[in-house]
Amino acid sequence: MQFVNSGISVTDLRKTFGNSEIIKGVTLDIEDGDYVSLTGKSGSGKSTLLYMISSLDPPSSGTIKIDKKDIYRMNEEEIHEFRNKRMGFIFQFHYLLPEFTAIENVLMPARKAGLLKEYQSYAEHLLEEFDLKDRMNYRINRLSGGQAQRVAIARALVMNPKYIFADEPTGALDSTNTKVVMNILEKVNRETKTTILVVTHDPDFASKTKRQIHLVDGRVVSLKEFEAIKKSAKTAR
């Protein structure tokens, strides 16, 4: 399967649960190498939108093209290959396998692709970069929450993905580890030009990204409208 480069294009995306429309006609573009945050209050549809854009949850209607390929028109084999080669995922909870060591968890995507030996040295390099060199052979239950999340980020990066999709990657971390993760993602985007789309409710985190997309009740709104809605909500309290 041949891949081309052209970023992410979302057109009139909608998601309905029962009689409720959660995502309401979202259209947006993300260029190659961009670092974008999805912001908004809890329940605004941020995570739902991220999961649809990243191929994990099909929309009710609308189209999502990544590198000019309509991802929901791919067959199962194509989307599996696309995810494994071009996408990395980071979640609020790391979902690491406790029976394996840090390095074994990082190498899981390479193992699935049958490329374990080819990526061994790079996996070790990532853990060293993330200050985990002396813990790469530790099982996950011996790591702190911040260390485990760094392992999860290394796992997302090990196949050199073009796209990183992150859903509240600092949501379960203290302020010190939050800054570590923020700095790692900023460095990855700057040095490797990896396109990153991150969901966050943290304004400090969002301010570190190149661009913010503001969601209110499933709609993308301008910064001016977003600030006005926030101000109105505070006044109503």
Swiss-Prot record:
> Mind listing the GO molecular function terms for this protein?
ATP binding; ATP hydrolysis activity
- Major location category of this protein: membrane
Q: List the disulfide bonds.
A: none
Instruction: Name a single GO cellular component.
Output: plasma membrane
Which CDD domains does UniProt cross-reference here?
A: ABC_MJ0796_LolCDE_FtsE (cd03255)
* Source domain of life: Bacteria
Q: Gene3D superfamilies, from UniProt? A: P-loop containing nucleotide triphosphate hydrolases
- Entry's localization field: Cell inner membrane
The membrane-topology field of this record reads: Peripheral membrane protein
Q: Which InterPro entries match?
A: AAA+_ATPase (IPR003593), ABC_transporter-like_ATP-bd (IPR003439), ABC_transporter-like_CS (IPR017871), MacB-like_ATP-bd (IPR017911), P-loop_NTPase (IPR027417)
| Residues given in the record as ATP binding sites | G40, K41, S42, G43, S44, G45, K46, S47
SUPFAM superfamilies per the UniProt record, alphabetical: P-loop containing nucleoside triphosphate hydrolases
**What keywords are assigned to this protein?**
ATP-binding, Cell inner membrane, Cell membrane, Membrane, Nucleotide-binding, Translocase, Transport
- Determine if Nucleotide-binding is one of this entry's keywords: yes
Name the EC number(s): 7.6.2.-
Residue intervals of the ABC transporter domain: 8-237
The entry's function note states: Part of the ABC transporter complex LolCDE involved in the translocation of mature outer membrane-directed lipoproteins, from the inner membrane to the periplasmic chaperone, LolA. Responsible for the formation of the LolA-lipoprotein complex in an ATP-dependent manner.
Query: Partners and quaternary state?
Result: The complex is composed of two ATP-binding proteins (LolD) and two transmembrane proteins (LolC and LolE).
What family does this chain come from, according to its entry? Belongs to the ABC transporter superfamily. Lipoprotein translocase (TC 3.A.1.125) family.
Q: What is this protein called?
A: Lipoprotein-releasing system ATP-binding protein LolD
